[in-house]
Amino acid sequence: AWYGIDSATLESNRKYNMAGEFYDEEGNSLYYKDQIDNYKQDHYQLHWNQNYLGGWTSNFGLHYTYGRGFYENYNVGYDSPDYIDRRWLDNDFYGFIFSVNQRTTKYNSTIGGSYNKYSGEHYGEYLWIDQDSNSENSYSFKEKFYDDYGNKNEFNIYAKIDYYLNDKLSIYGDLQYRNIKYEAGISANSVFTGYVEEGFSRLDKTFSFFNPKFGLFYNLNDSNNIYFSYARAQREPTRTDFANGSPDAEKLNDFELGWKLTLENSSINVNAFYMIYDNQLVLTGQRDINGYEIRRNIGESYRLGIELDSNITLSSKLNLNTNLSISSNKNQDFYSIFDGILKNYGNTDLAYSPSFIANNIIDYSPNEKVIISLRSNYVSEQYFAQTNSPISKLESFFVHDLNFIHKMSIKGLSDDINFKVLVNNLFNSKYVSYGGYYTYDVPTDNQIKTYEGTYYYPQAEINILVGLDFKF
């Protein structure tokens, strides 16, 4: 159900879902009964942890995941025949991880790494095409209209240390090297059907990243400490990013400064951050034909803000947990094409980046067996479009959930049973938490006119979940 709904439908019928909808010969609206997602994974893991003399420990793990499945979709052809298709994934993911650690009174050091390989087939097949609407249609049952593959090999190794200079000051360092190799083959029909962007037929790309981190911690006293850290992080594009364009790696310099207060019945942590990006991969608001969100590189951008996290015990029965974030998230000197003209939009807000987020949990325990929690979440307004187009603004929302847990036991069955009731959206707010923005160009009178549109994912109104957990 990744289609979403437009603004008019949001006002008139927010529960409408067009996935699988089609019309019979009399024009009646029907829904395809097998409009489904069917995906499975099998996980296998082997872990070996060993302790040695001198504070040494080692960890080694092997893993393998086999995933396969499809989504089946009824497609209304409008000017072409209706058809039903399946789009498949069949993939293997396996590798190993390791680490060796030594902890002493002066330092805590670790050397480790991992190797992982993902190998996947991606293909689509037709299950049915409305031959009556186009007698020249030659597709047959389960004929593949694209047949692609994608491989990703990743290796990383790191060394890190926490070193205690004295009882007040400690420093840490973390050096990581990552190597990523992509291989992908794209069939010609993938481009024809819109599965990937035109011009993309094969991917053979290698990335190598060196990511250093360092920081220091200073204990002012038993209750207060401060810290500073710097991290260099680099992230490769995904296969989907390549299928929708020619992206570059994202690079980030992250500076953070924090203070933590710990008292007998409360704790407060304040963290300031300044994140400087080069070629940040950001959401455009659009989705490709398979429903994946499309990302693009932008030039220079940043995120500057402050976070607060607190936990306060008000009494033996009442506890308050709060976290909030205030930030400025900006594109710098942002350019985009509109009406066929390259325009400078200046400094714009990064899409999908609200400037204020707050969460609050009030826990009340009348006795040792019952916990009642009121959870509140506020998210300020944000944009779907990097251009900050007015129609792409998503309004703020404020929602509350009520959670009830009763601990009990049943003799002869279990001594640890939790009866749970969760009331989501307690006050029945009609809100939207996510959506998208798109544009399309229409040539008119020797010029290009750009049209805009939005789609939304309205969230559920008040709903109740009841559960029972047993431990044997």
Feature roles, as predicted:
Residues 234, 276-278, 320, 328-330, ...:
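C-terminal beta-signal and adjacent terminal beta-strands/loops
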Residues 351-411, 427, 432-436, 440:
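C-terminal beta-barrel architecture of Gram-negative outer-membrane proteins
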Residues 51, 57-63, 219, 225-231, ...:
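Membrane-embedded beta-barrel scaffold of Gram-negative outer-membrane proteins
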